[in-house]
Amino acid sequence: MKKKILLMMSLISVFFAWQLTQAKQVLAEGKVKVVTTFYPVYEFTKGVIGNDGDVFMLMKAGTEPHDFEPSTKDIKKIQDADAFVYMDDNMETWVSDVKKSLTSKKVTIVKGTGNMLLVAGAGHDHHHEDADKKHEHNKHSEEGHNHAFDPHVWLSPYRSITVVENIRDSLSKAYPEKAENFKANAATYIEKLKELDKDYTAALSDAKQKSFVTQHAAFGYMALDYGLNQISINGVTPDAEPSAKRIATLSKYVKKYGIKYIYFEENASSKVAKTLAKEAGVKAAVLSPLEGLTEKEMKAGQDYFTVMRKNLETLRLTTDVAGKEILPEKDTTKTVYNGYFKDKEVKDRQLSDWSGSWQSVYPYLQDGTLDQVWDYKAKKSKGKMTAAEYKDYYTTGYKTDVEQIKINGKKKTMTFVRNGEKKTFTYTYAGKEILTYPKGNRGVRFMFEAKEADAGEFKYVQFSDHAIAPEKAKHFHLYWGGDSQEKLHKELEHWPTYYGSDLSGREIAQEINAH
């Protein structure tokens, strides 16, 4: 009897082992069903999946990805898929709601941008100029604003490589049995992207004209990565004839800078093109944002690479012709945030403007969380400083051992936390000081003085947060010392910086990078 039981147990073990092997084999041999959002995501995902899955695209050509809202049928497709791949929450803004509605936990959700930091969307950049070695308060980012981040990373071959790597890594983790194939497919696709990146670099690195004018500000990453300046204009669309007033101002702008082409996202109607040519003396050309290809175009052999090479060819209509530097129609850099204001606009502020719990950004600089920021800054400086030089510069500025500060506006107290040890003092407002920096911009220091005689190095403190009147701070630079307010006014190299304690390091890095 005992032998029969042992035999039965052995047979059962063999059966289950066989079933497990079969299940793994089915998973390895079966195809993964992947739903993607719009064309670049579809293209990149197919490049990774290869023959190991079926890839579907929700948005067809002609659909505006920015305005798309999924139907019940679309959500059902996502629900029934093995994986769902999208670009970024700033592009497909509806994805966060769809995630919440998914009842199936088997769907692997992949964000193409992964942990990439993005730049601010059009109209949200504060245009900081931070290549100077002196801290002029137009060098740092503001935290906590509801910025629209620019998601158009796929229009830069250089950044598209990272998107493909993110898709590869996420799908490989979800389907380890297919990881080897995914990695091999991705490697082949990435090689093609690297070749495209080389083509863009070769054509644009020595461009005779670095600026191009576009109606659709989608090419910021492409411009950044290849040393160009994207200048967007308002009041001109490919399908609506501009007003007489707009034509008049545009004509002056075009003549002032010798602009030959304005780039549109699609073919401008013949009427619009003729009006621009006749009245403003400028031609219309197409730079595709690659948000969709028709079935006909794909069957004809068009894909990401053919369209991107066509974009490069069209862009060279401008970049291959020498001309004066083209500036935006309006100077958006001279803002209060950047240090341009009138004395009468500066108002007194109370400690309550900085109430809350704050963390130093210095640890995030040390652990590499901010490294992407330095890379971006180096590219924005166009060779004036390297990423390593930026990191050194901010290391000096951010350095502090006061890791946390808690401010109670009602009690008018500040608690400084150093190595876990807390020191709390009560402060009174001591006025404001307007400082003028070498480039001509200015900043305001709001001064406070501790009541306690034993406050020591925390006797005098000064806040600077790019604001000049009462408002709730989103981040701040803090100066402190035990000698005098006047001595602190001279401190321009060292500015410990603090953000809300509820923010992650990546969230802080993203906000810094958006400016």
Curated annotation (Swiss-Prot):
CDD domains: AdcA. Zn(2+) binds at H66, H152, H216, E291. One of its GO terms (biological process) is cell adhesion. Residues 1-28 form the signal peptide. The lineage of its organism: Bacteria, Bacillati, Bacillota, Bacilli, Lactobacillales. The His-rich loop facilitates the closure of the zinc binding site and is required for zinc acquisition. The gene is adcA. Residues 125-148 are annotated as: Disordered. Residues 129-148 are annotated as: His-rich loop. Belongs to the bacterial solute-binding protein 9 family. Disulfide bonds: none annotated. This is Zinc-binding protein AdcA. The keyword Ion transport applies. Part of the ATP-binding cassette (ABC) transport system AdcABC involved in zinc import. Binds zinc with high affinity and specificity and delivers it to the membrane permease for translocation into the cytoplasm. Keywords: Ion transport, Metal-binding, Signal, Transport, Zinc, Zinc transport. InterPro entries: AdhesinB (IPR006129), Bact_metal-bind_prot9 (IPR050492), Calycin (IPR012674), Lipoprotein_PsaA-like (IPR006128), ZinT_dom (IPR015304), ZnuA-like (IPR006127).
